[in-house]
Regions:
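N-terminus-centric sequence/structural signature that marks the extreme N-terminus
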Residues: 1-153
Length: 153
């Protein structure tokens, strides 16, 4: 079971220190022993610990779109990702991996905005940073199988 973390400065003015994010990610080592990933930009930091189950070789996170302005971290599994991937390819999206269910999320958000969420079948918690609009979106599966906690401080 993976784990995701994030820090967002309310005004997006205070830089997130990599050491802050790395400390948070270290607390999740029991949830994902296989790898960790972090990214910081514009008052936002996203991180994750991964238990590699799907796409063992190329499923590293955070996952970015081609231009790097949309970033995703997620925990879970998207059962219908191949179907969504085929539809996105018809819209011109290119994938680095044919096997990453999480990579589908960044392209689906890019194509449909938050309207992509009802298309997802599976269990997931995800966070998306959209650098184009400077907005953060967090979501989880309909039944809450993958929990998502957040707070304002």
């Amino acid at each position: 079971m993976c784990g995701i973390v994030g820090i967002v400065d309310r005004d997006l003015t205070r830089a997130v220190l990599p050491s802050e994010l790395e400390q948070m990610v270290r607390t999740l080592v029991h949830r994902g022993p296989d790898e960790e990933g972090t990214i910081t930009v514009a008052g936002v930091g996203l991180g994750m610990r991964r238990l590699a189950i799907v796409d063992l070789a190329t499923g590293q996170q955070p996952i970015l779109n081609e231009t790097g302005d949309i970033k995703v971290v997620a925990n879970g599994e998207i059962y219908n990702f191949r179907e969504i991937q085929r539809e996105l390819e018809q819209h011109g999206h290119r994938f680095r991996s044919r096997h990453s269910d999480i990579e589908v999320l960044v392209h689906a958000y890019e194509q449909w905005g938050e309207d992509f969420l009802p298309k997802l079948g599976g269990m997931f918690a995800l966070v998306i940073w959209d650098g184009r609009t400077r907005t953060l979106m967090a979501a989880r599966d309909r039944t809450g199988e993958k929990p998502l906690y957040w707070t304002n401080t």
